[in-house]
Every structure is written in C-alpha cells, then in structure tokens.
Amino acid sequence: SLNIELHKMTVFMIIPKAIQDLALPFVDRYFTAILSEAVQDGLVQAYLNGDGKNAPIGIMRQINTTDTDGTNKAKTVLTTVKKFSPKGLAPIRKTLSNNGLRTVGTLYLLCNPNDEAEYVDPALYGEALTGGYRNTSFLPIEKIVDANVPAGKAIITIEKAYVMGLSSVSMKTYDQTKAMDDADVIIGKAYGNGRAIDDNTAVVFDVTKLEEYVLPVTQVTTPAS
C-alpha cells in the first residue's frame, strides 16, 4: 500500500509594527533568515528523532514498532562501543550491512558539540609517531556535529538511507491577530513526511563509553652481550 500521510510543520514570528514602519532595507532579509533557520532546525529534529505520530520517523526510532501513545519506539542504545577499531565497530557495521545484504562504505557519525569535544575526538584522533595528531580509524568516518543530537548519545549511519518529501514553505502575514500589541504575526508552513529505508540504516550508541585513543608503544629490551 502507498502511505501518503503528511505532517504539517509550522514556524512563526511576532514582529512589532514599529520595526516595519522604519522600512530598513535589511529587515525583511533578517526575518526571512530567522524563519529559514527555524525550518531547517525543525527538519533536522524530525530526521533525528521525529516521533512518527505528528512528525516523520527519525533515525533514532524504530519504523514498525509503536508505544501505547502512538509514537514510534526509540531504538535500543548500544552500550558496547568503546573504540573506533575494527573490533569496536564490528557490531555497528554488521547492523548497517543489514545482515550482510549491503556493502557499508563511509560512516557518518552524528553527535552533540559537547560530546564531540569530550568523547568523540579523544577516541577518533591520536598522536602520530611523527608528531601531531591523526585520524586513527581504519575506514572513513565523517563527523556531523549538531546541537539537536541528544547529549550522551551518538548515531552512526550511512548515506542514501533516508527518504523525505517536503512541499514548498509558504509564508503569510497576519496584521490584525496581535493588533492590541501593535505587532504583526508571520506564519510559515510546509507539509511533508520521511523515514529511513529500514531500521538497520542507523545505530544509536552511548557516546560516553568511548575510550581515549592511546598510541600503543612496545618496549624492546636488548639482551646484554
């Protein structure tokens, strides 16, 4: 069957009429930029953790399993990822391969800015023998840092694994709604939906379990002659 259910995304802003009366050239661009940023932020939240009831199904949620309130259940958080080594990433790569049915290339790691500084970078980068720091991962990992990722959790996903459709964003100004406050209300809205192609396209893990990378050093003792 074809599911054509759509969800409405709404953004709004209240603007004092006095600002409009000034007719400064940058005012319209400034308000448009703020509303555009709000739309983008809403789309990111929906992609990450949309509840599937009043929003798209986020990659942190299960597609076909719901709670009693009608929202899609959160995925189980993996707590065994401690290193970005072949062994450390094996459980994640096995899941992303969908039980061996697809090849996994570049991994995309989504994390909160605080967790990037405290956990991700110390585990991902290490001192090189020649000085400086290097990426210690054995395969490509691309970081995507966003404040919408919940602190303490991170997600590893793959490309071309999420489908989202969105209508154009329409903006309308209401000049009487807040008349007593001498203000205009601008409301923008769009319709859309989205979901991952399957539950195995993204893995949520406890980022606080990551261990700092330590350069392995082997001490060799030369036997006395």
Which residue stretches match the model-derived regions?
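Short helix/loop capping segments that flank catalytic or ligand/cofactor-binding pockets
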Residues: 22-24, 118-120, 195-197
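Tubular lipid-binding modules of the TULIP superfamily
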Residues: 199-201
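Alpha-helical scaffold segments that mediate packing/assembly in large oligomeric complexes
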Residues: 2-93, 204-224
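Beta-strand elements of well-folded, non-transmembrane domains
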Residues: 41, 190-194
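Extended oligomerization regions of viral-like shell subunits
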Residues: 53, 57-190, 214-225
